[in-house]
Amino acid sequence: ELEHPFTLVFTLANLSRIYTSFHNVNRALEFADEAIAVSTQYSFALGLALATASQGWALAEQGHEAGLGKLIHGISATRVTGANLNIPFTLALLAEIYLRNKRIDEGLGTIEEAQKLAGTGGELFWHAELLRLKGELLLAQSDLSVQAAEQCFSEALKIAQAQHATMLELRAATS
């Protein structure tokens, strides 16, 4: 057992985020719930915010309507702490939920915000995933957007290959 609650919270929150990137809902939720419990016990606002976002994503993936609200709350709470790291990734999760719920305009707006934040913050690791999701949203928006969507997928694939990001490359290639 780890006797340092601050380290424990961030380990749990980061494990939850890792499992969200693999779309492993059950493990993401398990670690998020643990991080929330410890964060609440010790009043760790950032750990609570990060874990709440992951928990919200997992619940939304399971079809719980409250999940979307928790995800949005987690993003807002993270921003309140002044932390900006991983916000583009979390916004990508939000855009994915919007896509699944056919809320295309909100999804596209979320992707646009994530791309701006990633560019200004130098957080470009998820750039390929943001482009892939933009392509998926464009495809869902209209048949007139097919060419723009294909361009997003192509660019996402090139970026993922250049970054040697195999997981993101596979996602882009299968979109």
List each language-model region with its residue ranges:
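Helix-coil-helix junctions within alpha-helical repeat/solenoid scaffolds
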Residues: E1-S175
